[in-house]
Amino acid sequence: KSGPTHLGKVMILRGKSDSSILWLTIWANLSFRSPVVQWYAYCVPCGAYQKKELVNMLSLYRDVLVPNRTDLNAINALLETLHRSPLGEKWGLGAIFRESNKARIVKTAPPEKIPLHALIVDLALICRETGKTRLNPFELQNDHQFSPCRIFQMTDNQLTKACVQASRLNPEFIRILKEKGSDLIELLPPATPENILNDYYNKIKI
């Protein structure tokens, strides 16, 4: 049986002191690894949903006309993750309310700014998956597969502003380039998810 990845080891070792950055990193990583999280992050817009609606939406996404236990179990696991972590309520990814013994899930834009290190981790994961080191914020907003805009419910404008700020605070990881009137985000060689997380935890200890 394989053990945790390098990123997983960093999260286990360093993640106890700040659960938000840990959970946002887990969410970003799951958006590449879990088909259900990827579907929920990229295909389910902000709004209010009953659990039954999400089950039906997932089955249609899978081209299955009648929802089955696979769909129900997947949604149950997703909602459990959102409920037991800061992701659902604090970060707007799916706050869960009980109404007449039924679960109502509300997905909104984050009520707080996404921490810059969590955002850079997600960008670093995109670079690792795609092999690209330069990313266009406008293209990221419209990307249905790899996008912090969709994972964290951000606009390309918000993403650009956050990355400009990140480039000032963490110039060793990220910089902004001007190309044909557009801003490009460039991730530098040290910007691995592991290095970014370690940098974050080193700084909060100071």
Where does each model-flagged region fall?
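Donor-sugar nucleotide-binding helix/loop cap in glycosyltransferases
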Residues: 1-206
